[in-house]
Regions:
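Active-site glycine/GP-rich loop and adjacent strand/helix microenvironment
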Residues: 1-147
């Protein structure tokens, strides 16, 4: 994702930059005026935006948190159909620290630290990221392990 797209983060606790704006209250008039090409937030927030006709150009990032289930296939399909851009999942800790992130090959979630778990796929990923990952079908196991 280089260069950084104009991104609206619809959750508190993130750092803003010139191209990344944080909207802790979710989608607001201010967020709409920002005209993001990418949005990031919890699946519940993203679902509320699916009927607004937003024209995104880059990606949707769905946050899941420790103790929560992974992004459902139904939500993934809904976001793809509604926004017309790729959908990526990021699994975050309580302080919004990145624990695992979906790669561009959509081959699963690459973990940011090694848990030594035998369930991690340590084979080369099509995206080129050498970090071990949970394959797409096993992401709920990752959520349980990170909890």
């Amino acid at each position: 994702m280089d260069p950084t797209p104009r991104t609206a983060i619809l959750a508190p606790g993130f750092q803003e930059t010139k191209l990344v704006r944080v909207f802790p209250a979710g989608w607001t008039e201010e967020a709409a005026r920002f005209h993001p090409s990418s949005i990031a937030g919890r699946a519940e927030q993203l679902r509320l935006l699916t009927e607004r006709g937003l024209e995104l150009k880059h990606a949707v990032v769905a946050f899941t948190y420790q103790g929560q289930a992974a992004l459902s296939d139904d939500d993934r399909d809904l976001f793809w159909e509604s926004f017309g851009v790729p959908v990526f999942e990021q699994h975050l800790g309580a302080g919004n620290e990145l624990l695992a992130m979906e790669c561009e090959a959509h081959a699963g979630l690459h973990v940011m630290r090694d848990f030594g778990a035998s369930r991690l796929d340590r084979n080369s990923c099509a995206c080129g990221n050498p970090a071990p990952r949970f394959q797409r079908r096993r992401i709920d196991e990752l959520a349980e392990m990170l909890a």
